[in-house]
């Protein structure tokens, strides 16, 4: 990187040391914040009167040299009393609130369907939102060192999340990393006020914990509009418990041990449309996170689809619970494959992964 006048030319974002001392600089451009690999930044003996808040994004900075500049006394006091990282944190937390990101673009699935009336179009069209909300215990300053503390604070984030959910007015919300306490104390009562009902299960570890510890275990939450859909049944899928029941897994000790130790879950909702009478299955899953366990993620995805097939076949045989509108004829289902199924979640997978190939194509080669 080089400083030219008051402009910065970014050449190497992996730069670890930058010395711009004694250059008569009167300002540091905001682009300095792009050099997030900096561990040392020397700005001695310039003409700086302020430091840009973008220095706050330099979360790996261990040495900041600012002596010899006509800066505000409080900046010198912070670095003298508490050190470089305290000054970086101060600049990070005092940065102006950025412009909100653009609204998300919805993916519209225009199926090749026969012409429908306005009433039918309304009944058979719905919106689905899937969102990993990053639970409080994972949103640490160590993990997100470039983020202001006020933006990481759960009290701030949960209100933003709720506001965003309500603004989209979708028929289904599939949320991951929802702590048990936050589901029952915050999201469920708040979304109830907007006409939603929720399904929730935490990760399997919650069963062995005390009540106070259990409140901080995260899991999957699915919300649906109660004036549009009626919940018929719900199911918990615990991937490690399914693995325990699979004799073919026990034949391969390595995969059995790798899958059994991961307590990821999926929650399944079986619903019926109140007006049109059709059935729908909504699956909400959170797969294991570690990139080193790609095989485990693929096994979890396969178990999810296997369970959905079994549950779907059972659901197809159940008589309808709702009395649909006179303008609609409730469909009959020969098997679960005929029931519309939504598979949502955080799969911790990329488009070149076995999980993506399996879910998009129905199979994955053994050498993936």
Can you say where each PLM-predicted feature lies in the sequence?
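Acidic/histidine-rich helix-loop elements
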Residues: 134-155, 240-254, 258-259
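Leucine-rich repeat
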Residues: 11-15, 34-37, 57-61, 81-87
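Metal-dependent phosphoesterases centered on the DNase I-like endonuclease/exonuclease/phosphatase
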Residues: 192-194, 292-368
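Short, small-residue-biased leader/transition segments that mark boundaries at the very start
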Residues: 2-10
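Structured beta-strand-rich core segments of catalytic domains in phosphoester-bond hydrolases
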Residues: 98-125, 172-293
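The feature encodes a structural signal of leucine-rich repeats
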Residues: 6-7, 28-31, 51-54, 75-77
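Conserved hydrophobic beta-strand positions in leucine-rich repeat
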Residues: 18-20, 41-43, 64-66
């Amino acid at each position: 990187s080089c400083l030219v006048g008051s402009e910065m030319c970014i050449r190497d974002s992996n730069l670890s040391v930058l010395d711009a001392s004694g250059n008569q600089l009167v300002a540091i451009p905001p682009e300095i914040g792009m050099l997030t690999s900096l561990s040392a930044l020397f700005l001695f003996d310039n003409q700086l009167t302020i430091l840009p808040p973008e220095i706050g994004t330099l979360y790996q900075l261990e040495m900041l040299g600012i002596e010899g500049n006509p800066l505000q006394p409080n900046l010198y006091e912070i670095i003298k009393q508490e050190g470089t990282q305290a000054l970086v944190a101060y600049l990070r937390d005092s940065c102006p609130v950025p412009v909100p990101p653009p609204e998300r673009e919805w993916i519209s699935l225009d199926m090749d369907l026969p012409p429908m009336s306005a009433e039918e179009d309304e009944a058979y069209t719905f919106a689905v939102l899937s969102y990993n909300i990053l639970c409080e215990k994972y949103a640490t300053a160590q993990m997100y060192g470039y983020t202001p503390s006020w933006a990481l604070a759960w009290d701030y984030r949960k209100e933003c999340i709720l506001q965003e959910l309500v603004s989209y007015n979708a028929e289904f919300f599939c949320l991951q990393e929802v702590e048990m306490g936050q589901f029952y104390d915050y999201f469920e009562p708040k979304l109830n006020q907007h006409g939603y009902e929720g399904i929730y299960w935490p990760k399997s570890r919650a069963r062995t914990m005390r009540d106070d510890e259990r409140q901080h275990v995260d899991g999957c939450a699915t919300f649906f509009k109660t004036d549009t859909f009626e919940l018929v049944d719900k199911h918990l899928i615990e991937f490690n418990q399914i693995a325990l029941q699979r004799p073919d897994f026990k034949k391969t000790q390595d995969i059995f041990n790798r899958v059994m130790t991961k307590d990821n879950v999926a929650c399944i909702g079986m619903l019926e449309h109140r007006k049109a009478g059709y059935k729908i299955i909504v699956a909400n899953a959170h797969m294991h996170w570690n990139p080193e366990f790609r095989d485990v993620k693929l096994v979890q995805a396969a178990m999810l689809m296997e369970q959905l097939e079994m549950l779907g076949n059972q659901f197809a045989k159940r008589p309808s619970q709702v009395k649909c509108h006179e303008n609609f004829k409730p469909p009959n289902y020969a098997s679960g494959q005929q029931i519309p199924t939504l598979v949502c979640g955080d799969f911790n997978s990329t488009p070149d992964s076995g999980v993506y190939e399996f879910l998009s194509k129905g199979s994955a080669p053994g050498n993936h």
